[in-house]
Curated annotation (Swiss-Prot):
<feature type="binding site">
    <location>
        <position position="161"/>
    </location>
    <ligand>
        <name>S-adenosyl-L-methionine</name>
    </ligand>
</feature>
<dbReference type="InterPro" id="IPR019410">
    <property type="entry name" value="Methyltransf_16"/>
</dbReference>
<comment type="function">
    <text>S-adenosyl-L-methionine-dependent protein-lysine N-methyltransferase that methylates 60S ribosomal protein L1.</text>
</comment>
<dbReference type="GO" id="GO:0032259">
    <property type="term" value="P:methylation"/>
</dbReference>
<dbReference type="InterPro" id="IPR029063">
    <property type="entry name" value="SAM-dependent_MTases_sf"/>
</dbReference>
<keyword id="KW-0489">Methyltransferase</keyword>
<protein>
    <recommendedName>
        <fullName>Ribosomal lysine N-methyltransferase 5</fullName>
        <ecNumber>2.1.1.-</ecNumber>
    </recommendedName>
</protein>
<dbReference type="GO" id="GO:0032991">
    <property type="term" value="C:protein-containing complex"/>
</dbReference>
<keyword id="KW-0808">Transferase</keyword>
<feature type="binding site">
    <location>
        <begin position="139"/>
        <end position="141"/>
    </location>
    <ligand>
        <name>S-adenosyl-L-methionine</name>
    </ligand>
</feature>
<comment type="similarity">
    <text>Belongs to the class I-like SAM-binding methyltransferase superfamily. RKM5 family.</text>
</comment>
<feature type="binding site">
    <location>
        <position position="95"/>
    </location>
    <ligand>
        <name>S-adenosyl-L-methionine</name>
    </ligand>
</feature>
<feature type="binding site">
    <location>
        <position position="241"/>
    </location>
    <ligand>
        <name>S-adenosyl-L-methionine</name>
    </ligand>
</feature>
<dbReference type="GO" id="GO:0008757">
    <property type="term" value="F:S-adenosylmethionine-dependent methyltransferase activity"/>
</dbReference>
<keyword id="KW-0949">S-adenosyl-L-methionine</keyword>
<feature type="binding site">
    <location>
        <position position="214"/>
    </location>
    <ligand>
        <name>S-adenosyl-L-methionine</name>
    </ligand>
</feature>
<dbReference type="GO" id="GO:0005829">
    <property type="term" value="C:cytosol"/>
</dbReference>
Amino acid sequence: MVFHLKPFDVDNIHEHIFDRYTLLESLADGLSQDLGIHQRDEIVQVDIEPPITTKVKGKRKASKGLQPYNFTIRQSIAGLNSSSNANSTTGYVLWSTTPTFARWLLYDGNALPLREEDTDTSIPAIFSGSKSTAVVELGSGISGILPIVLGDQVDHYVCTDQKGILSKLKYNIEENLLQFNRRRCISEFLQIEPPSNEDQQRRNTRLEIMELDWEKFNGPTAQTHLTRISEECSTVHIVAMDVIYNDFLIDPFLKTLNHLRNYYLNEGLITHCIVGIHLRAQDVVEAFLERAILEYNLPICSVEDPFLEKTRVSLYYI
C-alpha cells in the first residue's frame, strides 16, 4: 500500500482541516506540544536512519539496502531569538518537519513512488533513475539535511534562502559532506570540481546554494542555477519544509512557488511541488490552502499516509 493524494477544492478544505486537527487532538498525549524546534542546543546530532524491523537472537536489526545519514549540525539559538535581524530568524535552527519528511521519504514503504520509477502510479519519482531529476528547495534553513539526503539521490539540487542564512547553511553542508554515500558532489558555490579521473561507478550531483528573497522574486530572469536545471533535467520537484507558520508568509511564498512552477512547466519539465507544514495555528493552514486554490489556481492535494497522520506534519503535493 502506498500513500494516496486527496485533491482539494474550495468545498473540502474545511473538512480536511477539521479532520486533521481532530485527529491531532486525539493523539495529543503522544505528541510533543512544543512549536516544532528539533532541539535547543547549539550543536545537534540528527540521525536519518532506516527503521528497525526484525530481531536476530534478541538484537534489533535495520532494514538492508537503506543507507543511514548521520548529521552534526551547528545552529544558532541566539539568531532565532534575535530582535535586531530585519529578516526572518526561524531558519537559524532545525525544525522537526525536515527530519520527519526525510525519514518518511527515504525509508517508508508507502513513499516508494517518490523513490523509484515505474511504480503503478502516475506520480514521478523524485530520485534520479533513468531520467535526470532536480530539486529546488525554498527556505532551506541552516541544517543542510535535505541538500545532502535528497542531493545524494538526484542530479541537481539547489538550496535557497535569505542572504543571512547562507553562510551557516554552507558550513553545515561542508561539515557533513561525507554523508554523500551514493553520489559524488560537485559545486560552484562550495568550490568542488569534478575529479580528473572520472569514477564511472558514481554519478555526480550538482549541489548549489543561492539567495532567493520571496518578496523580490519574479521568476528566473538570468542565467542562474535555477535556469541550468531547465537545460539539463527532465523533472524537477520544488520542496519546502515548515516555511508556512504565519499569515504574512503565505502570499510571498505562493507567488515564488507559482513563478518557479510556471517557469519549469513552460520549459517543458515535469514539475511538482511538495510543501510540508508543521500543524500549529489552524487558521494559517486553512488560509494557505484557500489562497493556493482560489488565488493561484494550484492543483493542490493532501498526502494521505498512515505514518504522517500520526505526526504534526502535513504534506501537500502540487
